């Protein structure tokens, strides 16, 4: 205590007081929380010691900073924590006086609180007293969650049963004397976000019995219509009566409406504060790719894989999501999932002219069965392959299909791309990473946009995108030409992309001359049928493709129904009304497809 100078008392509670102090050497302000032990019950004493031990172990950028702690003369537990100049959220709501917070600010606060709770829940810690007066604001209006006096450490499958907390923020299962878990904190957080949004408590009554009745029935007033439907629905999902139907903190962080704010937090957070893994730097989080106007430029890409799980989401800027298109996956703190964000400049497609030629070097990613960093192997320094793009309309969209595939396997276009094989590329053979120049619409199960779904051609095994060349060096090297044409429809705009790959086999070696002859025959047959290949699209007369499309539609509809997203389900099924598509015809061709498949 000799190291600190007491400035003033800033708070007082039933079990102690809070003092504003200044460190004599650092000249920095802190908060001294003194919890009285004398004339207290054993439970209160245990709670004070537990808070001291717990706050000393947690480390998260959105939880109050721990500085020091000690027991003073056996009568007080003293805890030194970081000082938040912005006060607590309850004071901020009172100062608002009818002037609502912006949705952007509320979403940022919600993401920070969810990350704090996700960190606690991943470490089996229940806060049990999440309320606006325990949410503090820093000078730059960032969130700090504090007051762990009622926190409880659970075992892996344990539940809490003690009725503790603030009545207005208690969940229905706690009031019903039912054992509760981490979803109780989600309910309390939902009450806080509701209060921050509506500037009034979610549940308020004149007596305790009426309050309990409102909470158990989960009766809340409508939120202000100035906020988007997605944001209001997100708050309502946190206030569902059944804890099984409430999303967890990790699931809420993956909600499409919060993705821009999650990305901002990842970029701003320090690696030392447990949001970004220590082996990654914030600079590596987002890689922008732009092409200069010169006709020749060299692009060097580098990709790392931290496990055998790959989560890729293509997103496109929209009025509601004003941020750079990114490929991202969100780190789940309870597991060892990797965080990989790749940002693609939107101007990439527009800057590539119809006759611009550029060279690329790509790397092959070795997939390992365990969650260990995989090796990145780059190809030797050779003459890089040349790729030319002809732009027919204002945009280009390229798709990629695996080279090695079985005869009957047809991948649905909406599924994620498979990982590259662990095969090391040979000299003279180069693969082109089209994903690095790809601009794709935002189409996902969690955020359906029917008008943005592109029609991807379902390539078959006899239509490989690149022709592998295995040839022994001959006295007079002959370049092989492989022409690949694919036609893709996106936003009512026809795009034809021509891939011309020239492989100079000066250093390449083959095992026999048969490989070279087969490659030449395949190239000639490809050139002969290029006209018909250019026009390939989704074949509406194909029973198998239509059956797969309908299967995907039904799966999509079932998932929307299960998540109670009825508005999006209505948009999805609207084209299949009585005046739109005949259910009878649909049943006929579906039955035919089943019969043919059975044969």
UniProtKB/Swiss-Prot annotation:
Residues 511-530 have a biased composition (Low complexity). One of its GO terms (molecular function) is ATP binding. Residues 4-258 form the Protein kinase domain. ATP binds at residues 10-18, 33. Residues 364-386, 461-482, 504-542 are annotated as: Disordered. The keyword Nucleotide-binding applies. InterPro entries: Kinase-like_dom_sf, NEK_Ser/Thr_kinase, Prot_kinase_dom, Protein_kinase_ATP_BS, Ser/Thr_kinase_AS. The active site is at 129 (proton acceptor). The keyword Cell wall biogenesis/degradation does not apply. Expressed in anthers, pistils and leaves. SMART domains: S_TKc. It catalyses: L-seryl-[protein] + ATP = O-phospho-L-seryl-[protein] + ADP + H(+); L-threonyl-[protein] + ATP = O-phospho-L-threonyl-[protein] + ADP + H(+). Its EC number is 2.7.11.1. Keywords: ATP-binding, Kinase, Nucleotide-binding, Serine/threonine-protein kinase, Transferase. May be involved in plant development processes. Belongs to the protein kinase superfamily. NEK Ser/Thr protein kinase family. NIMA subfamily. This is Serine/threonine-protein kinase Nek1. It comes from Oryza sativa subsp. japonica (Rice). The lineage of its organism: Eukaryota, Viridiplantae, Streptophyta, Embryophyta, Tracheophyta. The gene is NEK1.
